[in-house]
């Protein structure tokens, strides 16, 4: 049986950590002028994937 291919879009967006998966916060790529400095600062750090979404991410990444 051939090797499973991971979804390349998911591989670019999610990274495996010891506690699960991390991802970049949304709403940070464009139209930043109307967003406050505080809002942009809080959107900056990486976030943990919700535990209910972890099985889907694992399946997309073939883990």
From Swiss-Prot:
Alphabetical keyword list: Ribonucleoprotein, Ribosomal protein
Organism of derivation: Hahella chejuensis (strain KCTC 2396)
A GO biological process held by the record: translation
InterPro entries xref list: Ribosomal_bL35, Ribosomal_bL35-like, Ribosomal_bL35_CS, Ribosomal_bL35_sf
Region named Disordered: 1-55
NCBIfam families linked: rpmI_bact (TIGR00001)
Biased composition (Basic residues): 1-25, 32-47
GO cellular component: cytosolic large ribosomal subunit
One Pfam family linked to the record: Ribosomal_L35p
Listed name of the protein: Large ribosomal subunit protein bL35
Similarity annotation: Belongs to the bacterial ribosomal protein bL35 family.
């Amino acid at each position: 049986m051939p090797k499973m291919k991971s979804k390349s879009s998911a591989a670019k967006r999610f990274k495996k950590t010891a506690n699960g998966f991390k991802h970049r916060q949304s709403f940070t790529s464009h139209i930043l002028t109307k967003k406050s400095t505080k809002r942009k600062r809080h959107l900056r750090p990486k976030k943990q994937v919700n535990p209910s979404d972890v099985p889907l991410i694992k399946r997309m990444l073939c883990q």
